[in-house]
């Protein structure tokens, strides 16, 4: 064929195959024919392969082809700003070890799956390989691809695609970017991966992002027409960065579809998601959603970035699993439409289906500046009043489990929301369970850990759900060596209406400071509901609250019953239990809305019904060393002088005496006045740091014949092996301080 210079410069066959690839120039369409077929595999080989904006690279394959395997053997990267197209349901592999960039107009028009990779070769089941760096004539195979082999320095992959062919958008009303057909796989496997306001869409299918290091091998495990990507032979990973300019030009990764959704897997060393956008997976119909799995050394979400799974139909939402040594969820940002986007990880049901679970396995988790991690039974906006009237969901929320071996920090707030871990319900669905297992937990500066049931009303104050069928608050279980709640930090399981949930804390040290709160109160809007239970088990540890800083442990019900508070601890300091009478007396009012220990400056424990004394709850405190509610011990008016022996009992072979020596410096009777003249002004003197005797005579050992008596120990010393030895004589010592010498002793 006769090719233009532009065509030759962009798509150039390298003539290394038994049957060479041919490129036909048909206007803005570059028709790719020929190539070498082996069974259901069709091989193409190019020296250069790039597609300009507005152009189409059309692989004109026969419909019986299963895999189109395309390699680039030259030294330049592939820049795809147009469309890649193929016939039938063939899968398309694009292999360029120099790098691949998808521009803002890049799109896919293929019936099968797409794998874009910067691997150096692809390996087949029979052991053969198709190499992009060793372009000699290969022995082509009819075998199935089983792996991607990378070189010493895998090149990056960039996606900037905001393509919307025929105006199509995804569920979030954003451009689809690179999109495959429903049920198919979209995979980018390379070195560093960048999504720069670029989106990936695979409705009901699978999205795979893998960032691998030098000499890695990624296994392709065939399934029914697709693959599972396995990284067991990868020794090190590279980084993935997902950024969004704004809401209109955001990076979205989604497999959401009308009848379900697929799976999303992202794996790398450092994974960063910045700006409004992220990884989003919803099922919109009756089928269940797929799962989201993130594997990383460090994961960061910031400035409104989100990883969310959910359901807007009857189908069950997918599970979200994060495995990363460090996880940071930071802040949020205002969008160009002037609403606040929260950085969040979560799972939500908006309608009838149950939400999936969220599991985070890490060493350290930090949620700061208004970031959220949430599982929720939420609601959906009614079409006639978007963002105003919410029809509550009936599906149940999922469970949230945090396993952080070292540290969990929930700290701070944004202008719109507090940093939080939460499992809540807004309607008839039940809230999920929230579990935190960590070495150290810090909830500070307005941070919250909460489960609960909340009521959302419309613009005229009406609740649109079933008021008589409200979901239950979930339970909250925390196990940590130490727990610090500080500066308006909260751990709560509260309800606006209905039954409060339960809180169980297992710890060795619980510290509460500056308006901190642990609460399972119910009926927050002055309605019915029983307070939940609080169990704090610090059997070998301590509970320490700063006095007069309004730190409270509460299990109150407004018109329902108070809950139970059970505390097992070795010591309880700075906080005391108050009953109804105590609260009324201290607050100075018996108004039920005022009988609340949070209105006091003291640190208190309370489990009452605010309206009905017969429904008060129970506070049980076991084995405290200090009972702060017992007050001071009364001393006798005339103290007795007891006879006390502080040494061995004297035998008849010794003489014993007790003397008080001095110039009335110490009174012999506690009723005698201590006058200021009894203690003279005396100077301190320095003593040389040398070996010296005490200023009394060392006792002499006396031998008694035929008397087998016990000699009272006069001192003790430590042998070199750590053994403590009692001695009958006082030792020589080296003083380390300046002793006080009274002038007249």
Regions found by a protein language model. Give the residues of each.
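Extracellular and secretory-pathway beta-repeat/beta-biased strand scaffolds
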Residues: 1-745
């Amino acid at each position: 064929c006769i090719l233009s210079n532009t065509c030759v410069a962009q798509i150039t066959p390298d003539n290394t195959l038994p049957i060479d690839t041919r490129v036909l120039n048909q206007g803005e369409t570059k028709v790719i024919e020929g190539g070498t077929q082996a069974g259901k595999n069709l091989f193409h080989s190019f020296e250069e392969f790039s597609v300009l904006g507005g152009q189409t690279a059309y692989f004109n394959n026969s419909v019986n082809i299963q895999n189109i395997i395309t390699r680039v053997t030259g030294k330049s990267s592939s820049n795809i700003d147009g469309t890649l197209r193929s016939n039938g349901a063939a899968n398309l592999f694009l292999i360029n070890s120099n790098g691949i960039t998808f521009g803002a107009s890049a799109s896919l028009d293929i019936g099968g799956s797409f794998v874009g990779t910067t691997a150096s070769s692809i390996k087949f089941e029979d052991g053969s390989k198709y190499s992009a760096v060793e372009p000699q004539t290969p022995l082509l195979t009819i075998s199935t691809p089983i792996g991607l082999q990378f070189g010493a320095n895998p090149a990056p992959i960039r996606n900037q695609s905001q393509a919307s062919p025929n105006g199509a958008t995804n569920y979030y009303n954003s451009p689809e970017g690179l999109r495959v057909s429903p049920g198919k796989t979209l995979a980018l496997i390379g070195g560093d991966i960048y999504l720069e306001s670029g989106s990936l869409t695979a409705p009901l299918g699978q999205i795979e992002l893998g960032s691998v290091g030098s000499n890695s091998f990624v296994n392709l495990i065939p399934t029914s027409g697709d693959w599972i990507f396995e990284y067991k032979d990868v020794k090190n990973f590279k980084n993935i960065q997902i950024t969004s300019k704004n809401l209109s030009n955001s990076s979205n990764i989604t497999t959401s579809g009308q009848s379900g959704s697929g799976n999303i897997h992202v794996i790398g060393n450092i994974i960063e998601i910045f700006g409004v956008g992220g990884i989003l997976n919803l099922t919109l119909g009756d089928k269940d959603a797929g799962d989201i799995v993130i594997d990383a050394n460090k994961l960061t979400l910031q400035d409104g970035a989100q990883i969310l799974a959910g359901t807007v139909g009857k189908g069950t939402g997918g599970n979200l699993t994060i495995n990363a040594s460090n996880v940071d969820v930071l802040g949020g940002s205002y969008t160009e439409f002037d609403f606040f986007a929260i950085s969040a990880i979560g799972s939500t049901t908006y309608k009838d289906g149950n939400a999936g679970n969220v599991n985070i396995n890490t060493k350290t988790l930090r949620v700061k500046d208004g970031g959220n991690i949430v599982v929720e039974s939420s609601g959906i906006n009614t079409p006639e009043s978007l963002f105003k009237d919410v029809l509550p969901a009936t599906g149940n929320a999922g469970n949230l489990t945090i396993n952080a071996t070292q540290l969990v920090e929930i700290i701070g707030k944004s202008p719109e929301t507090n940093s939080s871990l939460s499992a809540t319900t807004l309607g008839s669905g039940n809230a999920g369970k929230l579990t935190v297992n960590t070495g150290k937990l810090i909830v500070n500066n307005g941070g919250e850990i909460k489960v609960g049931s909340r009521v959302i009303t419309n613009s005229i104050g009406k609740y649109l759900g079933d008021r008589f069928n409200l979901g239950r608050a979930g339970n909250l279980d925390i196990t940590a060596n130490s727990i610090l709640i500080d500066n308006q930090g909260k751990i709560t399981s509260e309800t606006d209406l209905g039954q409060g949930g339960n809180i169980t804390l297992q710890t060795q040290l619980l510290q509460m400071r500056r308006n901190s709160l642990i609460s399972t109160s119910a009926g927050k809007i002055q309605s019915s509901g029983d307070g939940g239970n609080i169990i704090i088990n610090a059997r070998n540890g301590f509970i320490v609250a700063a006095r007069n800083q309004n730190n409270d442990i509460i299990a109150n019900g407004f018109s329902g019953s108070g809950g139970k508070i059970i505390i097992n601890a070795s010591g309880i300091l700075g906080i005391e239990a108050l009953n109804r009478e105590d609260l009324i007396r201290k607050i100075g009012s018996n108004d039920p809305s005022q009988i609340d220990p949070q209105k006091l400056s003291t640190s208190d424990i309370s489990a009452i019904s605010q309206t009905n004394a017969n429904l008060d709850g129970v506070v049980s405190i076991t084995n405290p060393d200090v009972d702060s509610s017992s007050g001071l011990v009364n001393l006798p008016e005339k103290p007795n002088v007891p006879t006390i022996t502080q040494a061995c009992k004297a035998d008849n072979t010794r003489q014993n005496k007790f003397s008080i020596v001095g110039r009335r410096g110490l009174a012999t009777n506690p009723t005698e006045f201590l006058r200021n003249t009894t203690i003279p002004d005396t100077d301190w003197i320095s003593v040389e740091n040398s070996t010296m005797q005490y200023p009394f005579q060392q006792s002499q050992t006396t031998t008694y014949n035929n008397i087998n008596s016990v000699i009272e120990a006069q001192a003790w010393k430590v042998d070199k092996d750590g053994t403590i030895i009692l001695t009958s004589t006082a030792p020589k010592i080296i003083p380390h301080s300046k002793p006080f010498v009274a002038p007249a002793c």
